[in-house]
């Protein structure tokens, strides 16, 4: 089916282009959401009359989206989750969690604007794209950590997995040294020998 795009659609085309798409995509996505019109002779004429109005609306929406993009561009959002020692989350960080983090800061974005292919399932710093407008896209950092202290260490660039391993090794060394130099343990050994 041929359709006329009423706005820019990712991986499809710009506003005003006539593109050929599968019937199901047009009927179930583009047409109901007002992103396209069927490419009939009548609709082509209507589009030419509507084109100036659509371009003005698109420009206003793009300016508003640019203001929002300036607020969130490069922002770092911290999401706290429980995780295993290896850094694997018990659960995941989804689009809904990212939206809630921005809402806590007073910034409203919709689920369709967050471009997250798969849910985040590991601790660390992750780059996520947000399309505030079809023509305006920004990148934000999402730091997933077990605690606020750990999130700060991740943001400073420290490798938390080695820190945890170093702490475990240090604790084992202290425990071994404590057993080696424990004066009570020495007296117990002498008492058992007699």
Swiss-Prot record:
One of its GO terms (molecular function) is rRNA binding. The keyword Ribonucleoprotein applies. Keywords: Ribonucleoprotein, Ribosomal protein, RNA-binding, rRNA-binding. It comes from the Bacteria. Belongs to the bacterial ribosomal protein bL9 family. HAMAP family: Ribosomal_bL9. Binds to the 23S rRNA. NCBIfam families: L9. This is Large ribosomal subunit protein bL9. It comes from Rhodopseudomonas palustris (strain BisA53). The gene is rplI.
